[in-house]
Swiss-Prot record:
Family label: In the central section; belongs to the AAA ATPase family. In the C-terminal section; belongs to the peptidase M41 family.
Cofactor: how bound: Binds 1 zinc ion per subunit.
Membrane topology: Multi-pass membrane protein
EC top class, as a word: hydrolase
Protein name as catalogued: ATP-dependent zinc metalloprotease FtsH
EC number: 3.4.24.-
Subunit: Homohexamer.
Lineage of producing organism: Bacteria, Pseudomonadati, Aquificota, Aquificia, Aquificales
Binding-site list for Zn(2+): 425, 429, 503
HAMAP family in the cross-refs: FtsH
PANTHER family: ATP-DEPENDENT ZINC METALLOPROTEASE YME1L1, METALLOPROTEASE M41 FTSH
Originating species: Hydrogenobaculum sp. (strain Y04AAS1)
Length: 636
């Protein structure tokens, strides 16, 4: 590919030099100061003995009169009488070959030929370069669009093993079974079993689908063929199907083997959707895949493994038994899984003694394996930036904040008055988190701007919650209202800010779901009303139910929010003095943890109902827990 580009560049350079040389020669040979003259006039001047000197270049005559005037004209080919006349009249005549246009002239025939053929050679070079790009090979593959782009691993395998995959023990068992079958198929066939023809890994981005496939390739003792779904999509009709056939032809030659198709939704999207483009190349590719997986021309020994983030859009024919027999969901890791993943990624990183990976695992609920690896990498970069020899706990905590909330904006210009209001807002959230007995334990409060947030209150639950009772939900609403209520208690109704916008949105949504989704309202009763919000092109919200029912739901939601607001405001007003001390400390240090927060409250005689809690080691805990983080972010 680089050679073809170099050839094209040299074509352009040579062509430019030829054209420049030709123009320079013509410019040098031309006489811009000569006066054009007709041949008849020149003949008359010769007869009148007015010409003293003449220079003949091919078919052009440049004559100099005796009074110093320079004139030029052209003579027809073969007309030589004027030359004889000038010699007869004593004119000094010089003759030289033409500088261009005469192919027979010495040295100019090559230049003329190159000028004539240069456009043809230029277009030929561009065409060859395009063919090499699309064919992805040498000159013999200029038109080989249908060749597969799959990578075949026979001797060289990815250096990833199942031991490098953590946080998905059940999935690893399924994969280990496939490896066992490839190693000893007779043991399974003895019982009449057959291997699955296809395995589909699906889950959210970053959970480890491709990593698991790499581990399978590293463990299996059979050839591994890897290809992306987008490799089958091309601008030419039929190329995708041809590449699909070529991929499976390669697989048959290397059977038994494994074919891994990453991002299969690129070609496996459900058929029948509206296609404004006429012929759908993707559908042809999908049809060919269906035939290859379970058609008349199938062969034994080929295992298809695919990965996707969108199983809901795949064609039903692709998911039926006989094609993808097993569909394995890869979830986000729980707290134990996150702990195991952190240990795997921390093996090659020097950690200080104060690093607690268990606490990091609890502080990162909802994080995928890719997110956790990114956190450890960010922590390593932060430690290197500070010229440390080890990664400390503070580096990991800062890395979590960077990933979750964005970079610190310490240079952001915030007036002392605004900073105080932000501190009051966040202190109100934190106080309600400590005063609600059913709330999740407080972790820390910060007023350092990060991303779009001006402050954040973080809670780290210690128990896994799969269901929530009404008390849990009401506690969440009280905590969300804490920021706005603190502003009103400290500054009055006219002093409230726009910082509670996100809090009110979340509280309203939660209250609506309490009433209309989970049926927890005594007045409305046990009923569930679906509400569809369509933001596309300004779409409106569509809610089921009669107008009277919807009106009753709205009244109950308003009542629930008003009650929570008044109760929250009462609690904050009763502890205003203690909260003022917290605000001063928060303005001074910008970040305080739960322990320091409680110590300040205890100095004012305030007893919290939800103290800071610690959990025993995950190594000793029998049941896995899944903490969830609750962030209250002030967006102004």
């Amino acid at each position: 590919m680089q050679t073809a580009k170099n050839i094209l560049i040299w074509f352009l350079i040579i062509g430019f030099m030829i054209v420049a040389f030709n123009l320079f020669e013509e410019k040098g040979s031309s006489s811009p100061s000569a006066t054009p003259m007709s041949l008849t006039t020149l003949v008359d001047m010769v007869k009148q003995n007015k010409i003293g000197e003449a220079d003949i270049k091919g078919d052009k005559i440049i004559a100099y009169t005796k009074d110093g005037q320079k004139v030029e004209t052209y003579i027809p080919k073969g007309y030589t009488s004027i030359i004889d006349e000038m010699i007869k009249d004593g004119v000094k005549v010089k003759a030289s070959p033409s500088s261009g246009g005469d192919i027979s002239s010495s040295g100019n025939w090559l230049v003329s030929m190159l000028i004539s053929w240069f456009p043809v050679l230029l277009f030929a070079g561009i065409w060859i370069l395009m063919m090499r790009q699309m064919g992805n090979g040498g000159p013999t593959r200029a038109f080989s669009f249908g060749k597969s782009k799959a990578k075949v691993y026979i001797e060289e395998k990815p250096n990833v093993k199942l031991d490098n995959v953590a946080g998905m023990d059940e999935v690893k068992e399924e994969v280990a079974e496939v490896i066992e079958y490839l190693k000893d198929p007779a043991r399974f066939r003895k019982l009449g079993g057959r291997p699955p023809k296809g395995i589909l890994f699906y889950g959210e981005p970053g959970v480890g689908k491709t990593l698991l496939a790499k581990a399978l390739a590293g463990e299996a003792h059979v050839p591994f063929i890897s290809v992306s779904g987008s490799d089958f999509v091309e601008m030419f009709v039929g190329v995708g199907a041809a590449r699909m056939r070529d991929t499976f032809e390669t697989a048959r030659k290397n059977a038994p083997c494994i074919v891994f198709i990453d991002e299969i939704d690129a070609v496996g999207r459900s058929r029948g959707a509206i296609n404004l483009g006429g012929n759908d190349e993707r559908e042809q590719t999908l049809n060919q895949l269906l035939v290859e997986m379970d058609g008349f021309d199938t062969s034994e020994g080929i295992l298809i493994i695919a990965a996707t983030n969108r199983p809901d859009i795949l064609d039903p024919a692709l998911l039926r038994p006989g094609r993808f027999d097993r569909q394995i969901f890869i979830p986000k890791p729980d707290v134990k899984g996150r702990y195991e993943i952190l240990k795997v990624h921390a093996k090659n990183k020097p950690l200080a003694k104060d690093v607690d990976l268990e606490l990091i695992a609890r502080a990162t609920p909802g994080f995928t394996g890719a997110d956790l690896e990114n956190i450890l990498n960010e922590a390593a970069l932060l430690a290197a930036r500070k010229r440390k020899d080890l990664i400390h706990m503070e580096d990991l905590e800062e890395a979590i904040d960077r990933v979750m909330m964005g970079l610190e904006r310490r240079g952001m210009a915030i007036s002392p008055k605004e900073k105080e209001k932000i501190a009051v807002h966040e202190a109100g959230h934190a106080l309600m988190g400590l005063m609600m007995p059913d709330a999740d334990p407080l972790h820390k409060v910060s007023i350092i701007p990060r991303g779009m947030a001006l402050g954040v209150t973080t809670q780290l639950p210690i128990d896994d919650k799969h269901i929530y009772d009404k008390a849990d939900l009401l506690s969440r609403i009280h905590i969300l209202m804490g920021g706005r209520c603190a502003e009103e208690v400290f500054y009055g109704k006219d002093g409230i800010t726009t910082g509670a916008e996100n809090d009110l949105q979340r509280a309203t949504d939660l209250a609506y779901r309490i009433v209309a989704t989970w049926g927890m309202s005594e007045n409305v009763g046990p009923i569930s009303v679906r509400r569809n919000i369509n933001p596309f092109l300004g779409g409106s919200t569509v809610t089921e139910g009669s107008p009277d029912l919807l009106k009753e739901i709205d009244k109950e939601v308003q009542k629930l929010l008003a009650s929570a607001y008044e109760e929250t405001k009462r609690v904050i007003a009763e502890n205003k003095e203690a909260l003022s001390s917290v605000v001063k400390r928060l303005i001074e240090k910008e970040t305080i943890d739960c322990k320091e927060f409680v110590e300040i409250l205890s100095l004012h005689g305030v007893e919290v109902k939800n103290a800071c809690k610690q959990e025993e080691s995950l190594e000793k805990k029998e049941n896995n827990v899944e903490p969830k983080i609750d962030k209250n972010v002030v967006n102004v």
